[in-house]
């Protein structure tokens, strides 16, 4: 226990009502957040002589101050606890590292509805289907739906300004509601209804309706229409045959847990209308000495009660671990959702199969993660030995990317003891320098990155500069001039020059811009971690540069073609459904646009291709 903190005096001031408490260390940092039905009883338990675990002993030894917030109910306390955990990220709490919102498929409420991927708040009028585990799953589903039920996926701004159908109509991926007469209101509405039923898991209803329409078309001797509907039926059947479907039409999340060597994996399986939409593995940050029960309880609370996660609530949550606060969690989630949410820990039948699947996936993902961590730990230990450092807890690497000096982008990637910390990767757009001056670009990004206050935990042990002596000289100059409140002498600056022909294993490392560098053996674990972070930085920089270049190119390509002024540009984009449609068009198709001659069409075609 802290010698300064007077626990007896503090406990006399604490109420027995429900609430949340925050524990601070001597530096004023929140080190733990907890909730309690009875604050006095819960807080008193921290200051007994026989504490439950070493983790609690270590926590109590650092307490300098405790803040208490009284709430009306336990539910309020639970919500506030998880909001505080998200805000303060205390080191003695189990922390959910991935707090991204989940993507949904959005069916708009327009006269002619469109399909799109959606993340975030659901303000737009329409229907939302999901959640899906990631953007890839949504894009894959949208592409599939476009082939089976060709309703539009274009933005409203494009849809409203069309006078002729775009390429999607020509290849059968859209019914073309943007142009009057191409599709009847009845047919478009019918296809939208099929999409709605399909995404709701009612495949049987879709097939029943399609079969009835096919038979009617055949009876009416409309054989082309019957053949088209037959193809649609076959496409729906092919999709549904591949899916693992429960006849019960379950709407639930299934959570499996694996715990080993101080690391936990929580695997969440998303099931909607009996269909497995996908899954995702999470590796929460677990303080040493934490029991598995606390890991599961804290994860589940953070997963559903923090921010956007509240909008992804299913009707039922299956767990393979019995929670002490199961009733409280279910009540809190039900209150948030405005409907009853069930939390089940002993399922049977299909639900037990789901849980076994989630548990197996959690165990498999944990084995893979532990193997990867073992590798990265060995590599960082080897690098620390080479650099004569006690340990490397954080490392950052910089790279510059541009095309002939244009659209310069600098990247910064971050590794910690577990490897890449992608949530902290950053890109910097570089401006105000001579085009192609990589030294000036490096100088600028380092000043922007380090010329300000930095939390102690965010100060890197090693800063890797990709580019060799010249770039390292820039880094040394920047750090020599820094006037910052943190210890600028803490990071070790290390330059890395690529080998001959940029071959991996031939890199040269530099501590100083002058003199000879040194190399590591090609099989050195220390070299492997340097190559890993350098390649990550390089890829991150190139990715940002390509996005920036594409953005500029999309707005300026047509402007550079002689004979294509604002009116012709507008006409070309309008008739071709945007720049991508124009890029895919032939010379003959471009020449059909009003005001575009055969000669100009050829010039436009070759300008876009080359």
From Swiss-Prot:
<dbReference type="InterPro" id="IPR001162">
    <property type="entry name" value="UvrC_RNase_H_dom"/>
</dbReference>
<dbReference type="GO" id="GO:0009432">
    <property type="term" value="P:SOS response"/>
</dbReference>
<protein>
    <recommendedName>
        <fullName>UvrABC system protein C</fullName>
    </recommendedName>
</protein>
<comment type="subunit">
    <text>Interacts with UvrB in an incision complex.</text>
</comment>
<dbReference type="InterPro" id="IPR000305">
    <property type="entry name" value="GIY-YIG_endonuc"/>
</dbReference>
<dbReference type="InterPro" id="IPR001943">
    <property type="entry name" value="UVR_dom"/>
</dbReference>
<dbReference type="GO" id="GO:0003677">
    <property type="term" value="F:DNA binding"/>
</dbReference>
<keyword id="KW-0227">DNA damage</keyword>
<dbReference type="GO" id="GO:0005737">
    <property type="term" value="C:cytoplasm"/>
</dbReference>
<dbReference type="GO" id="GO:0009381">
    <property type="term" value="F:excinuclease ABC activity"/>
</dbReference>
<dbReference type="InterPro" id="IPR050066">
    <property type="entry name" value="UvrABC_protein_C"/>
</dbReference>
<dbReference type="Pfam" id="PF08459">
    <property type="entry name" value="UvrC_RNaseH_dom"/>
</dbReference>
<dbReference type="GO" id="GO:0006289">
    <property type="term" value="P:nucleotide-excision repair"/>
</dbReference>
<keyword id="KW-0267">Excision nuclease</keyword>
<dbReference type="InterPro" id="IPR010994">
    <property type="entry name" value="RuvA_2-like"/>
</dbReference>
<dbReference type="InterPro" id="IPR047296">
    <property type="entry name" value="GIY-YIG_UvrC_Cho"/>
</dbReference>
<dbReference type="InterPro" id="IPR036876">
    <property type="entry name" value="UVR_dom_sf"/>
</dbReference>
<keyword id="KW-0234">DNA repair</keyword>
<keyword id="KW-0228">DNA excision</keyword>
<dbReference type="GO" id="GO:0009380">
    <property type="term" value="C:excinuclease repair complex"/>
</dbReference>
<dbReference type="InterPro" id="IPR035901">
    <property type="entry name" value="GIY-YIG_endonuc_sf"/>
</dbReference>
<dbReference type="InterPro" id="IPR038476">
    <property type="entry name" value="UvrC_RNase_H_dom_sf"/>
</dbReference>
<dbReference type="Pfam" id="PF22920">
    <property type="entry name" value="UvrC_RNaseH"/>
</dbReference>
<keyword id="KW-0742">SOS response</keyword>
<feature type="domain" description="GIY-YIG">
    <location>
        <begin position="16"/>
        <end position="94"/>
    </location>
</feature>
<keyword id="KW-0963">Cytoplasm</keyword>
<dbReference type="Pfam" id="PF14520">
    <property type="entry name" value="HHH_5"/>
</dbReference>
<dbReference type="InterPro" id="IPR003583">
    <property type="entry name" value="Hlx-hairpin-Hlx_DNA-bd_motif"/>
</dbReference>
<dbReference type="InterPro" id="IPR004791">
    <property type="entry name" value="UvrC"/>
</dbReference>
<feature type="domain" description="UVR">
    <location>
        <begin position="204"/>
        <end position="239"/>
    </location>
</feature>
<dbReference type="Pfam" id="PF01541">
    <property type="entry name" value="GIY-YIG"/>
</dbReference>
<dbReference type="Pfam" id="PF02151">
    <property type="entry name" value="UVR"/>
</dbReference>
<comment type="function">
    <text>The UvrABC repair system catalyzes the recognition and processing of DNA lesions. UvrC both incises the 5' and 3' sides of the lesion. The N-terminal half is responsible for the 3' incision and the C-terminal half is responsible for the 5' incision.</text>
</comment>
<comment type="similarity">
    <text>Belongs to the UvrC family.</text>
</comment>
